[in-house]
UniProtKB/Swiss-Prot annotation:
Gene Ontology CC terms: cytosolic large ribosomal subunit
Segments crossing the lipid bilayer: none
Protein name as annotated: Large ribosomal subunit protein uL6
InterPro entries, alphabetized: Ribosomal_uL6-like, Ribosomal_uL6-like_a/b-dom_sf, Ribosomal_uL6_a/b-dom, Ribosomal_uL6_bac-type
Family: Belongs to the universal ribosomal protein uL6 family.
Organism per entry: Chlorobium limicola (strain DSM 245 / NBRC 103803 / 6330)
Length: 179
């Protein structure tokens, strides 16, 4: 049995879950999330605890069991607490600022890069070298953070670029001087 899939999901008193045949809907103080279900898994809710079970023992069912348990767990956490990713900008002259609802990035190119986040994602810029991305959908928060990071990935020689908080950049030695 899947070690992740067999763990129950406890609902806080703030989160409500609605289970139908084809999808599951989780509602909380921060918003509502919906997820389509596959035929290989079934959900049961009793006394504020949701359990995910698979219908048979095929390889596909075993794979879906753990996946859907984590997806639903992330939905519950998202509508109650929310998710945040922090990006750090390193480099001379590299900076970020918020102009209306656009994120304006100066990253050493000949032009500025403007990024508009999806409606459910909130972007904050506490200072010029820090970007905070928050929302209720964990996958979407990560996707937006990865998209912003892709504008200037950290390079290994000087470490300039956009990196996740706590990310360690493997540094390389420059060319050795020849004779």
């Amino acid at each position: 049995m899947s070690r992740i899939g067999k763990m129950p999901i406890s609902l806080s008193n703030q989160a409500k879950i609605e289970i139908s045949d084809a999808n599951v809907k989780v509602t909380g103080p921060k918003g509502t999330l919906e997820q389509a279900l596959v035929a290989q898994v079934t959900l049961q809710e009793e006394n504020g605890v949701v359990t995910v079970q698979r219908v048979d023992e095929t390889k596909k069912s075993k794979a879906m069991h753990g996946l859907y348990r984590m997806l639903i767990s992330n939905m519950v956490e998202g509508v109650t607490k929310g998710f945040t990713r922090k990006l750090e900008i390193a480099g001379v002259g590299y900076r970020a600022e918020l102009k209306n609802d656009l994120l304006a990035l100066t990253l050493g190119y000949s032009h500025m890069i403007y990024f508009k986040a999806p409606d459910s994602i909130k972007i904050e810029v506490p200072d010029q070298t820090t970007i905070l991305i928050s929302g209720i959908d964990k996958a979407l928060v990560g996707q937006v953070a990865a998209k912003i990071r892709s504008f200037r990935k950290p390079e290994p020689y000087r470490g300039k670029g956009i990196k996740y908080e706590g990310e360690v950049i493997r540094r390389k030695e420059g060319k050795a001087a020849g004779k």
